[in-house]
Amino acid sequence: MTAAATVQRAQFRQLFVLIAVAFIDMIGFMLVLPVLPFYALKLHATPVQVGWIFAAFSIAQLISAPLWGRVSDRYGRRPALLIGLLASAAAYTVFGFADTLWLLFLSRFVQGAGGGTTGVAQAYVADTVRPSDRARALGWLSAATSAGVVVGPILGTFASRLGTQGPGLIAAGLCVLNAIFAWYWLPESRVAQAPGEAQPKRSVWGPALHAFLNPRLPVSRLIWIYGAGMLAFASLNAVLPLYLADEFGVNERSFGYFLTYFGILSLVIRVVLLGPVVDRFGERSTVRIGCVALIVGFLLYPMVGNLWLLAILVMPLVPIGTALLFPSTTSMLSGRVDRRELGVTMGVAQTFGGVARSVAPVLSTKIFQDLGHAWPFVVAAGIVGVVSLLAVRIGPAPEPTPVPVPAPSAPAAAAAATIDTPVA
């Protein structure tokens, strides 16, 4: 076997384990999410209190994402991911036994803090996958979370039959098993620091402020694209159940089918469509194509009066757009920063995304209530239009430097006998 083939196999093994970890993590998340509002109502929560319980996750993730990025840059991706998984396990345990609203709020906050490792996982991909394959690899990582979105609600339905404690305790158990799996099979990916090289020290919030104040810089522009795109997408997520309920009579039971439908669409598109589109058009054009799909999808939502036509012709445009926009943007971002700053840069991108996810539900539902059902979709299309203008001026990436691949751990080496498929 050639040295190049050996490197490729090592890269695939690491990516496979990371994808498995992300998949199981999302299953746990989706086990709990569908029952959360109903659990809160049983504890006599008001609608505003339910909203704060949901917001607690995004607020905690917003605070923790850059911190996790800095931790991963200094101590390694693997420790950050393991701590995040164990924090999620603790949060789900609290959720399972919560008998007051403040405990429910606490469980969501801790869960959000553990979920701030998303940027760490993306940095892990950038560490281990060659630049030409990063967009596809990030697409597979996103596909794993989409698969979790499909499987999680189904398991949650069965878990809820065990009582209110069922979903939380099963999710906690999955997180513990996931942490054990990652401990044995997920090797460290961070590039080793050269002897005598000083560790850069600056405020964790400095890069986020720098990106906010300098949107014309290449890296900052990509972070803004990611954040603005997330603002539009999260706006749809918040207002869609209200829109479908008022326009088509969809209720909380039938809305779950749409959640699964979106998960299946996202999974198929990211696995089947993303790679060929990036190969054919390149990452920059892929971002622009994704923006067009999102704009058309948002504008068509309020124009289609038949639920079946909406589901078949319009709803797929949004998963197509996000599947093309977000992985390609993240891939380009990873190719434009210093290797030692990957974790904190991905954390900054997640910070922008966290702000968007915190603001979007309030913004879109306020517009829905005060201006009418169509306006949230029009505003979302306008936001993506701004993203498109930013995307037009994305320049080419600098020439990549070789990425050293750490030797796989003993368990990962043993897995080579059963994992033979290279990264496509």
Please name every model-derived segment.
Residues S107-S146:
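Cytoplasmic helix-loop-helix junction between adjacent transmembrane helices
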Residues L141-Y184:
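Helix-loop-helix hairpin linking two adjacent transmembrane segments in secondary transporters
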Residues R284-T329:
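C-terminal transmembrane helical hairpin of 12-TM major facilitator-type secondary transporters
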Residues H44, G76, F97-W102, V304-G305:
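Helix-breaking motifs and short loop linkers at transmembrane-helix boundaries and internal kinks
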Residues P34-P47, V239-S254:
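Short amphipathic helix-loop junctions that connect adjacent transmembrane helices
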Residues L62-D99:
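Conserved MFS/SLC helix-loop-helix module at the cytosolic interface between two early adjacent transmembrane helices
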